[in-house]
A protein has these predicted regions:
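Short, solvent-exposed loop/turn segments at secondary-structure junctions
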Residues: 13, 38-41, 73-75, 108-111, ...
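Conserved C-terminal alpha-helix-loop-beta "cap" of PLP-dependent enzymes
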Residues: 127, 131-132, 137, 202-230
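Conserved glycine-rich beta-strand-loop-beta hairpin in the small C-terminal domain of fold type I
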Residues: 164-178, 190-206
Length: 230
């Protein structure tokens, strides 16, 4: 689509904000940043309160800079601990930057992939902008599907109860992978390390430089398909 992606190193608290702040403050051709703030792929990191605050108040050279805030895993907990982060839209209002925020979520990893419902949160001005463009994309949404989701999930408590069922099925899978890593790789020394996420759908395995693609190929030969290795 004619735009360039700039990668920023990740930390356990989110993207390296020193780098983010420097980039967006100095270059007015940088128009936005895409973030998955909770259980972010591939490491399962959750942005800290400080990171979210810095996102909300950072100075940007581009007056039309946007933050695309993808809450893909907002309720995808793998432990009994319910991690909640500050709402970026609320934080941005403290600094008068709410027009830069677009927050997204959906039920694609809750009910039906590709056939769930989605939601957008943004400022009033931004919502007017979006609705004007949505009006030429679709005449009417799938109201029956929306109704099915409301009747099934009902409310926040219903969503969390449903996700607890997902967790009971997923946790044994995560445990099996981590057990295999500990039993097979730990005795070999520093050849690999891996993440222990509290939520999301991924465990990241880090192997020695130059080995990732070969490891993925061997896994595929053994019948285990992994997310593309780099």
């Amino acid at each position: 689509y004619g735009f360039e992606l700039i990668s920023v190193p990740m930390t356990p608290n989110g993207p390296d904000m020193d780098i983010v702040e420097k980039l967006v403050a100095e270059d007015d051709t940088i128009k936005g940043i895409w973030c998955v703030p909770q259980y972010s792929n591939p490491d399962g990191y959750t942005y800290s309160d400080e990171t979210i605050d810095r996102m909300a108040k950072m100075k940007t050279a581009a007056p039309d800079f946007k933050i695309f805030w993808d809450e893909a895993y907002i309720v995808h907990h793998l432990t009994e601990e319910i991690i909640e982060t500050p709402v970026l839209l609320n934080e941005s209002k403290k600094y008068g930057t709410e027009n830069r925020v677009f927050m997204f979520t959906s039920t694609s990893k809750i009910t039906f992939p590709g056939a769930g419902v989605s939601a957008i949160a943004c400022s009033v001005d931004s919502m007017k902008y979006i609705c004007k463009r949505f009006s030429v994309m679709i005449i009417s949404y799938d109201k029956m599907n929306q109704l099915r989701h409301v009747r099934f999930l009902k409310n926040k408590e219903g969503v969390l109860a449903h996700m607890a069922k997902h967790r009971r099925r997923l946790v044994p899978c995560f445990d099996a992978v981590k057990t295999a890593f500990n039993e097979e790789l730990t005795p070999c020394g520093d050849i690999a390390h891996w993440t222990n996420p509290k939520g999301g759908y991924f465990i990241s395995l880090y192997v020695m430089p130059g080995c990732a693609k070969r490891v993925a190929a061997l896994c595929k030969e053994a019948g285990l398909t992994l997310t593309g290795a780099g």
